[in-house]
A protein has these predicted regions:
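Glycine-rich, anion-gripping cofactor-binding loops and their flanking helix/strand elements
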Residues: 64, 75-76, 82, 202-288, ...
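A short, small-residue-rich loop immediately preceding and capping a beta-strand
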Residues: 21-24, 45-47, 65-102, 259-267, ...
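Active-site diphosphate/adenylate-binding microenvironment
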Residues: 8-19, 26-30, 34-39, 332-412, ...
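N-terminal cofactor/phosphate-binding cores enriched in small/glycine residues
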Residues: 3-73, 79-88
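Thiamine diphosphate
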Residues: 40, 100, 107-113, 379-541
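Phosphate/pyrophosphate-binding active-site segments
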Residues: 1-2, 121-124, 278-372, 478-480, ...
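Glycine-rich, acidic loop regions that bind phosphate or pyrophosphate groups
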Residues: 90, 100-136, 227-334, 434-435, ...
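Conformationally flexible catalytic loops at phosphate/diphosphate-handling active centers
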Residues: 2-3, 132-135, 139-194
Length: 541
């Protein structure tokens, strides 16, 4: 019989799946349900030992014997402190030892990977436990072997309740490249060819990669390709980019029909919340993440496989291994995406960004701050030879202007920096440094505060709280821009913007950088945006 505590059940199932079969068990009240459960798993060989220090070194010896991992289980707190010496020895000898502790304490040892599992009260808690355990056990043998530490929060009651079977759990596997000498990857390719509904989603990538034409022809029609502008040109063909309007225009039945069976991802952050909700609500059977560092990026709570290699090398390697038949799935996505009309907005932040993007000169760089600037750019087609950069890895307004100026200072292109008023106000000290040249163009979107706060579904902000929630203000950038040597332009309507754009996108500015400040109304911006999405749900076209 096993405990009913789901973090322990997840751990037991994943220890078995990751071939951790030798476990040294130390007595203790807090780890009682854990010890009883592990001792009852028939696939485990368990060794009782009272002294934690001795138990740790005993586990080290077990792991040294045949090179397979061994585990030591004890209470947290003082008992875990006794294991510092064995952790140090295992780390230096690169031996796979799993330290498992249970208690209220969140003490973590300095191992290759240390995680704390919460008590499971919701499905989200259980999903988190599953991912953390997988990450820790994968790290036992990743860029060298070594110890890991898994700490469980275990609270009373400690009774062993009658759970007769371990649960079926998600097991994340890692392939280190696609070399037959490192790991047999044939089952991976067999699974790839088994699925007909295959999708590739590309996250943020600060580069341009041009695929050989032979690979483009082999790959493009085999997958539905989805990317945001911050993914740049890193796809063998033209991806679907109008993902937010497209998903909004789909009803529930259509979304269910269009979800992928196999999802492959590469690159960094994905900004679209609608895309994330779609893939979490309709999860793929398998999610493969391809990255050179082999990290477990579980963006959609569906990760099953990590392939540790350059994503472009991966795609070019599988190109000749994919069955030659062309599935209908990519064509369905492409046709559906083309059915959504091009977005058109009256005067607003969206229309300003659209006008600037359509006016970008060849071989320029578009540097977007986090959040709204990135989302709104997705409504428009960025020219193919324009590189897109954004500080959206962690989120937040801090440092976006300084990072963009740093990039522009060593770039020979015209650099168009798009950011909101709060991002500008947070980072305006960077303008005093003068570590930039005449190739800087700043599009400042000023709607008197944080527009994104008005966009939250169901949120009503009363007048008294408005300055605190949205950072509302009445400032403009004219004096600061001119003091710092910028040409200052401003627009409060479409006609004024059109008169400013030729100078804003020109190289001939007398050796000066340029700020274009566009004034809009936050409430109107959001109403225009919401009206657009309402129309997509109830189309009149």
């Amino acid at each position: 019989m096993y405990t009913d505590k789901r973090n322990i059940l997840q751990l037991a199932s994943l220890l078995k799946a990751h071939n951790v079969r030798k476990i040294v068990l130390c007595p203790g009240i807090r780890n009682l349900p854990l010890t009883q459960t592990l001792a009852n798993v028939p696939e485990f060989t368990c060794y009782p030992m009272t002294d934690e220090r001795s138990a740790g070194f005993f586990a080290l010896g077990l792991a040294l014997h045949d090179g397979t991992p061994a585990a030591i289980c004890c209470e947290s707190g003082a008992a875990t402190q006794c294991l510092h010496a064995v952790v140090s020895e295992a780390y230096r000898q690169k031996v796979q030892v799993v330290i498992i502790s249970a208690g209220k304490d969140r003490l973590l040892l300095p191992t290759k990977k240390s995680v704390t599992l919460p008590e499971v009260k919701t499905e989200e808690d259980e999903q988190l436990c599953n991912r953390l355990i997988n990450e820790a056990l994968l790290e036992l043998n990743h860029h060298g072997k070594g110890p890991v530490h898994i700490n469980l929060c275990v609270n009373e009651p400690f009774l062993l309740l009658p759970v007769s079977d371990l649960p079926e759990v998600r097991v994340i596997r890692r392939y280190r490249g696609l070399s037959i000498y490192d790991q047999d990857y044939k089952p991976l390719i067999e699974r790839l060819n088994r699925y007909q509904r295959r999708m590739v989603v590309v996250g943020q990538m600060n580069l341009i990669y041009l695929f050989d034409k032979r690979y483009t022809k082999l790959l493009y029609k085999q997958f539905a390709w989805i990317a945001e502008n911050i993914g740049n040109r890193t796809i063998p063909g033209q991806p679907i980019k109008n993902i937010d309007p497209l998903l909004t225009s789909m009803n529930r039945e259509e979304q269910e029909k269009m979800h992928p069976d196999l999802l492959i991802t590469y690159g960094g952050r994905i900004v679209s919340d609608r895309l994330k909700r779609f893939l979490m609500k309709h999860p793929p059977t398998e999610h493969w993440h391809i990255s050179p560092d082999g990290e477990a990026e579980d963006t959609f709570d569906a990760l099953t496989t990590i392939v540790e290699m350059d994503p472009f090398e991966f795609l070019e390697k599988i190109a000749n291994m994919i069955d030659s038949r062309t599935p209908d799935y990519p064509r369905q996505w492409e046709t559906r995406a083309k059915s959504v009309p091009q977005a058109e907005f009256k005067w607003s932040e969206m229309s300003v960004i659209g006008n600037v993007i359509s006016s970008l000169p060849p071989a320029s760089t578009l540097l977007m701050a986090n959040g709204s600037a990135v989302r709104y750019s997705q409504f428009f087609d960025v020219p193919k030879d324009v590189e897109v950069i954004s500080c959206c890895g962690t989120g937040g307004a801090d440092g976006t202007l300084a990072a963009a100026l740093g990039y522009a200072s060593v770039s020979t292109n015209l650099n168009f920096i798009v950011l909101g008023d709060l991002s500008f106000l947070c980072g305006m000290n960077a303008l005093w440094s003068k570590n930039y040249g005449s190739n800087v163009r700043i599009l400042l979107l000023n709607n008197g505060g944080g527009e994104i706060f008005h966009a939250q579904p169901g949120l009503t902000i009363d007048e008294g709280a408005l300055p605190y929630v949205t950072g509302s203000h009445t400032r403009n950038a004219k004096s600061l821009a001119e003091d710092c040597g910028f040409i200052y332009l401003s627009a409060s309507n479409e006609a004024e913007l059109q008169s400013c754009l030729p100078q804003f996108v020109s190289m001939a500015t007398g050796g000066k950088p340029v700020v274009l400040e566009a004034f809009t109304d936050a409430t109107e911006d959001i109403e225009i945006l919401k009206s657009y999405f309402r129309e997509l749900k109830n189309p009149i076209y």
